[in-house]
Curated annotation (Swiss-Prot):
Gene3D superfamilies: Phosphoenolpyruvate-binding domains. 3-methyl-2-oxobutanoate binds at residues 45-46, 84, 112. HAMAP family: PanB. Binds 1 Mg(2+) ion per subunit. Transmembrane segments: none annotated. Its main location: cytoplasm. The gene is panB. This is 3-methyl-2-oxobutanoate hydroxymethyltransferase. Keywords: Cytoplasm, Magnesium, Metal-binding, Pantothenate biosynthesis, Transferase. One of its GO terms (cellular component) is cytoplasm.
Length: 264
């Protein structure tokens, strides 16, 4: 199988062909996802909660991300692999570059960082040095203490305009992908249509170019609170491989996420 690249996703956007992505943290699941046709995976700092058992993503280190990135890469050698730079790993452009180099050496194709216009210099520095960047706007879990919890972002004209401005600034700085998390569908549509780069949604309705889910949410094995945007595909299929195929099919057809998974 040919490796999936940024250009592959750009073509999906141009052809209006939705694509499914998922988080992965180990060899076995990465291989299973790749075998079933998921070509884009994220080693997310969500592993702090789903794998390590913390109550937020804040304790995750660059070494943690690099360890899991290497495992996922071995399981899915041809996937487009994104890796999060965790909390306080990109406070300055120089720090971002050093830490990005670590996760790229571990096997990532691209790093994901959370934040808006304040990251422009960092995004420029990374892309100029051959480190592709995926932005992340809306609900950015590393900022949970600023937001006062996990809440929908971008409601109201002023907040929506600010997020759109941030998205355009990140794209202009060189970001090649954008994740939009927990924003109203109407705003997600505005941003997706305004950007030339592909937009991946999670809790942003079915109007984005792609979707991502935390694998534990997709299989209903998350303890405690289940996000509104999550869907347990394993409950409907009774088989992990079938669940992955159904997730992909529903994303590609626009069935998932439905109205019940979306915010306004």
């Amino acid at each position: 199988m040919k490796p999936t690249t940024i250009a592959s996703l750009q073509k999906c956007k141009q052809d209006k062909k939705r694509f499914a992505t998922i988080t992965a943290y180990d060899y076995s699941f990465a291989k299973l996802f790749a075998d079933e046709g998921i070509n884009v995976m994220l080693v997310g700092d969500s592993l702090g909660m789903t794998v390590q058992g913390h109550d937020s993503t804040l304790p995750v280190t660059v070494a943690d991300i690099a360890y899991h990135t290497a495992a996922v890469r071995r399981g899915a050698p041809n996937c487009l692999l994104l890796a999060d730079l965790p909390f306080m790993a990109y406070a300055t452009p120089e720090q971002a570059f050093e830490n990005a180099a670590t996760v790229m050496r571990a096997g990532a194709n691209m790093v994901k960082i959370e934040g808006g216009e304040w990251l422009v210099e960092t995004v420029q520095m990374l892309t100029e040095r051959a480190v592709p960047v995926c932005g992340h706007l809306g609900l950015t879990p590393q900022s949970v203490n600023i937001f006062g919890g996990y809440k929908v972002q971008g409601r109201g004209d002023e907040a929506g305009d600010r997020l759109l401005s941030d998205a355009l600034a990140l794209e202009a700085a060189g970001a090649q992908l954008l994740v939009l998390e927990c924003v109203p569908v109407e705003l997600a549509k505005r941003i997706t249509e305004a950007l030339a780069i592909p937009v991946i949604g999670i809790g942003a309705g079915n109007v984005t170019d792609g979707q991502i889910l935390v694998m534990h949410d997709a299989f209903g094995i998350t303890g405690g609170h289940i996000p509104k945007f999550a869907k347990n595909f394993l409950a409907e299929t009774g088989d992990i491989r079938a669940a992955v195929r159904q997730y992909m099919a529903e994303v590609e057809s626009g069935v998932y996420p439905g109205e019940e998974h979306s915010f306004h």
